[in-house]
Structure formats: C-alpha cells, structure tokens
C-alpha cells in the first residue's frame, strides 16, 4: 500500500513538473491610451522618475515609502529606488535607453518580496487627437515563475495597474497638473 502511495506521489510530482516546464518562458503585458498632449510632454513624464508620483498607479499605496533618485532626470543611467510596505516591496528602475520624444526603456528590478528583472518600454505615437502612449512590461520566467503562472496571470495582475497609471497620466497631462 505504501509503495502505491509513493508511486502515485512521484507520478503526480512528475506530472506537475512536466506541466510547469511546458508553460511559456516569457511574458508580456501591454496597455495603451490616447492622451491629448504632445509626445514631448508625455515623454518627459515617463522618462523622468521624479514625475512618476503624479501618475504612477503605485505611488499612493504606501504614503511612507522611501524613494531615492540618482542621475540627471530623463538621462540614461538615472535610477529610482523604493522601499515600502508589503504592497510595494522594494525595487529599482533604471532608465536604459531613450529616443526622445518617442521611446523610453527601463530596467525594472524587484528586490523584495521576491527578485525578478523585467523591461518596461514606453512607446509614444502621434495620432489624430493626441499621442498614443503604449506601456509594455516583458520578462523571462524561470521555473518558479512558470509555476506561479499556473495560478497568476501576469496580464490580469499587472494590466489593471497599467490602465490606472495611464488614466492618471492622461488626467494629469490634460489637466495641466504634471510637475515641471
């Protein structure tokens, strides 16, 4: 009887490992919104970390969050480091590439509660009625990340935050309340 239980458990574990191994190794979350403002103003808002508090969907989750900025605003190599409560954790963003006023790339590192590194890209396209801001986050999933993806859909987990952030960016830009 014990032998059958052990064999059944081994089969179950092997099936779970096989299922996790077949999960996608990458993820991508993307949202966009047209904002009635110039690409330059919007580029400055997303590439200058000092301005993120005006529109970031996470800025108000921890009023006591400690933030540190390094480097010149909107310059490659500038960083934004935060340490906060359980809702925001600890992490760092580094501006890695810019193509003013149409694109900003950011290395996003989560340090706590778990470590991961992803890329965020803001693409800006001139359209009738304003500028389309496209916010993309993509990354690699290791075995544990693939296992977590069985229970958590990255698009459903992060997508609504991107939608809130873009809506706040739109309100701040169109309402003239973005910091200079």
Per-region residue spans from a language model:
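Hydrophobic ligand-binding cavity/cleft-lining segments
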Residues: 4-72
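Short, surface-exposed coil-to-beta transition loops
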Residues: 28-30, 88-93, 115-121
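Short beta-edge strand/loop motif at the mouth of beta-sheet-based domains
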Residues: 50-92, 98-101
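Beta-strand/loop substructures that line and gate deep hydrophobic ligand-binding cavities in soluble
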Residues: 96, 107-163, 169-171
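Generic structural detector for well-ordered beta-strands
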Residues: 32-36, 81-83, 94, 105-107, ...
């Amino acid at each position: 009887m014990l032998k059958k239980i052990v064999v059944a458990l081994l089969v179950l574990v092997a099936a779970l490992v096989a299922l996790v191994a077949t999960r996608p190794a990458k993820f991508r979350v993307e949202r966009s919104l047209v904002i009635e403002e110039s690409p330059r103003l919007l580029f400055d808002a997303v590439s200058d970390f000092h301005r993120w508090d005006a529109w970031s969907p996470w800025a108000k989750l921890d009023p006591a969050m400690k933030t540190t900025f390094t480097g010149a605003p909107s310059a490659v190599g500038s960083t934004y480091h935060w340490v906060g409560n359980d809702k925001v954790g600890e992490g760092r963003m580094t501006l890695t590439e810019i193509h003013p006023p149409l694109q900003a790339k950011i290395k996003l590192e989560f340090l706590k509660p778990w470590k991961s590194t992803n890329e965020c890209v803001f693409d800006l396209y001139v359209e009738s009625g304003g500028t389309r801001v496209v916010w993309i986050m993509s990354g690699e999933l290791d075995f544990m990340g693939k296992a977590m993806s069985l229970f958590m859909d990255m698009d459903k987990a992060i997508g609504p935050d991107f939608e809130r952030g873009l809506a706040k960016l739109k309100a701040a830009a169109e309402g003239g309340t973005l910091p200079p």
